[in-house]
Swiss-Prot record:
Keyword RNA-binding found: yes
Region (Disordered): 397-427, 446-498
GO cellular component, one term: chloroplast
Pfam families reported for this sequence: PORR
Gene giving rise to this polypeptide: WTF1
Organism expressing this protein natively: Zea mays (Maize)
One GO MF term: mRNA binding
Function recorded in the entry: RNA-binding protein involved in the chloroplastic group II intron splicing. Binds specific group II introns and promotes their splicing. Functions in the context of a heterodimer with the ribonuclease III domain-containing protein RNC1.
Composition-biased stretches (Acidic residues): 417-427, 456-466
Domain PORR span(s) in chain numbering: 59-387
Subcellular location(s) per record: Plastid, Chloroplast
Record PANTHER family: PROTEIN WHAT'S THIS FACTOR 1 HOMOLOG, CHLOROPLASTIC
Descriptive protein name: Protein WHAT'S THIS FACTOR 1, chloroplastic
Length: 498
């Protein structure tokens, strides 16, 4: 028989025997701890720190308008700086073509068309055959000479600004190359390295460092170690004391955050800013070597330094990149831009332009500086020359008030068009967009030699309609001076009126 038939059915397997627990180095392993129930499984929440609080940045048109308004002026000043470096301040267009990269021109543009867009600043003259040169107009040259004279006359103020900048640094020493980034913003003379830095050894001296020459402070003046915020606080206290003496039974004043007009913050953001303001003020001229990086006290000191630097500038604004060059001297954090954005009650960061700009909020009112010095007034005159149109508009026919109103509407319309935002073409830089707008999108290869240099294919048409305008004016004058015409027959007899 088959062996399979002799097996019992159903087959019940024998019970498996378990092996004894193995020991690890002679001792049993402890059982893993059981996790706590779900309600008790809470992650530790870090303590709230004011310095790390995030504040959402919000666009503000008045400050962005300042950047947009200086868009053309920035290009013109670049052209002027290249021109004044030439002998007799005259330059050929062929030589100007070598500075395309400095002007921010990544594509070929018509330089002749670009220069003729600013007739109030540049004069394009012909010298010889196919030789074009350009120079400053008499009005633009006068403004340039006035600016040089004013910068040289204000040398004492420039020395005080350099001393205050050195007094705020940690080692009381700053590389001259870094100071040069703030040269125009502080109103320093063009050649301050060879003039201001060497003429006042009683205040600072030039020392040789591994990374280049540096400016080192030699005399500490306690009278200069007073920040603009402290002076403003003293004036505010004096004003409140006068009001307290004049007003009787005045209600108690509560500590509250006075936000600028138009600035909208959430309740949490306003609470964090209020807590930061209640912290004791740390002077930017005080010793900050003991302050720990990332702490609230260090950020309070950093905000004071940025506030003081912006107070020293001519227009109370500068580029954020210029401030980042001083990370080592002032121990700024790596996220300096984020730190400035976290305090919208003091600063405003504009993303308009190729590089971000930071404004001192208290120094502006509706996109205008509250206090303007002579350099700012000269810049406004230069902006007026830049705005001079190439082809003046024809005078409007009508009364003086109507013509004035029409010109005013045209001017306001041009101002609005210049100030409107153009965020669509993000691929090109702002300077490239401006050149494209001014030159009509044409390159140097688009024009021909000869008449194309002067005509540019956009000359104004001849005034064929002048006679019609004169006739219309005569008819209008005749009807206005005399009485209403009397209807008559062809033979002269008067007709009956209806």
């Amino acid at each position: 028989m088959d062996a399979k038939l002799l097996l019992p059915f159903p087959f019940a397997p024998a019970a498996a025997t378990r092996s004894p627990k193995s020991l690890f180095l002679g001792a049993p392993l402890p059982p893993p701890p059981r996790p706590p129930p779900f309600p008790l499984r809470l992650r530790p929440r870090p303590a709230a720190v004011v310095a790390q609080a995030a504040v959402k940045r919000r666009k503000e048109a008045p400050f962005d308008t300042v950047i947009q308004r200086d868009k053309k002026l920035k290009l013109v000043l670049k052209l002027r700086n290249i021109l004044v470096a030439q002998p007799d301040r005259v330059m050929s267009l062929r030589e100007l073509g070598r500075f395309r990269r400095d002007l921010g021109l990544t594509r070929k543009r018509r330089l002749i068309a670009l220069l003729r867009r600013f007739p109030g600043v540049f004069d394009v003259v012909e010298e010889g055959v196919y030789s074009l040169r350009f120079r400053l107009t008499p009005a633009a040259e006068r403004l340039y000479l006035d600016e040089l004279r004013l910068r040289n006359e204000s040398e004492g103020l420039a020395v005080a600004k350099l001393r205050k900048l050195l007094m705020m640094s940690q080692e009381k020493r700053i590389l001259i190359e870094k100071v040069a980034h703030l040269k125009h913003d502080l109103g320093l003379p063009p050649e301050f390295r060879d003039t201001v830095c060497l003429r006042y050894p009683q205040y600072f001296r030039v020392v040789r460092m591994d990374r280049g020459p540096a400016l080192e402070l030699t005399h500490w003046d306690p009278e200069l170690a007073v920040s603009a915020a402290e002076l403003a606080e003293e004036e505010s206290r004096a004003r409140e004391a006068e009001e307290r003496n004049l007003i009787i039974d005045r209600p108690l004043k509560f500590n509250r955050v006075r936000l600028p007009k138009g600035l909208k913050l959430t309740r949490g953001e306003a609470r964090r800013i209020a807590r930061f303001k209640e912290m004791p003020y740390i002077s930017p001229y005080a010793d900050f070597s003991h302050l720990r990086s990332g702490s609230d006290e260090k950020e309070k000191h950093a905000c004071g330094v940025v506030h003081e630097i912006l107070s020293l500038t001519v227009e109370k604004r500068t580029l954020v990149d210029h401030l980042t060059h001083f990370r080592e001297e002032f121990r700024f954090s790596q996220s300096l831009r984020g730190m400035i954005i976290r305090h919208p009650d003091m600063f405003y960061v504009s993303f308009k332009g190729d590089r971000d700009s930071v404004f001192l909020r208290e120094a502006y009112k509706d996109s205008q500086l509250v206090e303007k010095n002579q350099l700012v007034l000269l810049k406004e005159k230069m902006r007026a020359l830049v705005a001079v149109p190439r082809f003046p508009r024809r005078a409007a026919v009508g009364t003086g008030e109507e013509a004035e109103g029409m010109n005013g509407s045209l001017q306001s319309r041009d101002q609005v068009s210049d100030e409107e935002y153009d965020d669509e073409d993000e691929g090109l830089s702002d300077m490239e967009d401006l050149i494209s707008e001014l030159s009509g999108g044409k390159s140097d290869a688009d024009y021909e030699w000869g008449d194309g240099w002067f005509g540019e294919n956009d000359d104004s048409p001849p005034d064929f309609g002048d006679d019609e305008v004169k006739v219309a004016m005569k008819i209008a004058d005749g009807s206005a001076n005399g009485s209403a015409p009397v209807p008559v027959f062809p033979d002269g007899r008067p007709r009956e009126r209806w």
